[in-house]
Amino acid sequence: MKKRIAGILTAALIGTTVMGTVVMAAPSGAIDVISREDGSGTRGAFVELFGIEEEKDGEKVDMTTQEASITNNTDVMLTTVAGDENSIGYVSLGSLNDTVKAVKIDGAEATAENVADDTYKVARPFNIVTGDKLSDAAQDFINYIMSSDGQDIIEKEGYIKVDEKAEAYKAGDAKGKVVVMGSSSVGPVMEKLAEAYQKTNKNITVEVQVSDSTTGINSATEGVCDIGMASRELKDEETEKGVKATEIAKDGIAVIVNND
């Protein structure tokens, strides 16, 4: 990702000046950078993939420009970019809609097919996060997510399934409630999974609460929820607290601009 659009985007996000033609240039020539909030898995994955970070005192530091406008979830990002013809931002590929335009990266369009065959390289995992003490109800819901039934829903919603050979779901005898918390990028597909699952297994209810990846990971760690959602890899210091990540899908990150 060292071609022009990647360079322009990186420069815009860290607040430096780039000479040359911006592929999706705004009428005024200015670029309004729209970023996600600290704690967002999409932001964390994005700055890592584009190298928008520096190492300081042994730790990687996010170098997103202080001039960036911050949005706190996926829907707000889409609405903000759709309403500002000078803007550039980024969003989960599965959440991309026709209110904005996705730009090509290294000549590749942001599509699920291109993510699957590694043509489009701006991609990250969708993880669920669990602790050691998992309820039978939560385990049954996870079994559904990883079954062919769940993986087919993931693919239908525009994401990339992680198990092409998954077997069909077989309901157990668990009962109860499952609370899922975290990433606003994972949230939409998790809600679809929960809806379909509850039609199949009427003995279990699933509540999905959307926030961000870090909140989801922390909530799973502290036992506030049964399952956390994260749209990034977990850090060593997070897994050291006793939680583990399970990849349920793969998702691209689309770089987006205004349709005009």
Specify the residue positions occupied by each region the protein language model found.
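C-terminal segment of classical bacterial N-terminal signal peptides
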Residues: T16-M24
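Exported/periplasmic ABC-transporter solute-binding proteins
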Residues: R4-T10, M24-D260
